[in-house]
């Protein structure tokens, strides 16, 4: 059984920090999957094609693990 670890995440919109939090997961990969789902949902809440939404994950020692930036996706076309 793996022991849970804590990861810090910071979400930015167009370079400005808008939220910070802690992800609790047993592995880095699990934290990354959760963050992808969260960031994807968050990006849909911003203006498509103009807003850049990014997320940075570090471990509790402050070691940088990943940072990704997404252009907020365009809405799905209506049929």
Residue ranges and their predicted role:
Residues 1-19:
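Short aromatic-glycine-(Arg/Gly/Cys) micro-motifs in beta-strand/loop hairpins
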Residues 6-9, 30, 37, 63, ...:
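Intrinsic-disorder/low-complexity peptide segments enriched for small residues
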Residues 26-45:
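Charged, amphipathic alpha-helical segments
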Residues 40-79:
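Short, mixed-charge low-complexity intrinsically disordered segments
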Residues 9, 22-26, 56:
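A general secondary-structure boundary signal
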Residues 18, 33, 67:
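Short acidic, gly/pro-rich beta-turn/loop elements at beta-sheet edges
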Residues 16-30:
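A short, exposed loop/beta-hairpin motif centered on an aromatic-Gly-Thr core
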């Amino acid at each position: 059984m793996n022991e849970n670890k804590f990861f810090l995440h910071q979400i930015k919109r167009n370079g400005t920090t808008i939220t910070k939090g802690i992800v609790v997961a047993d592995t880095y990969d699990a934290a990354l999957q959760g963050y992808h789902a969260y960031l994807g949902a968050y990006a849909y809440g911003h203006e498509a094609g103009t807003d850049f939404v990014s997320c940075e994950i570090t471990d509790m020692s402050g070691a940088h693990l990943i940072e990704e930036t997404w252009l907020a996706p365009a809405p799905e076309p209506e049929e």
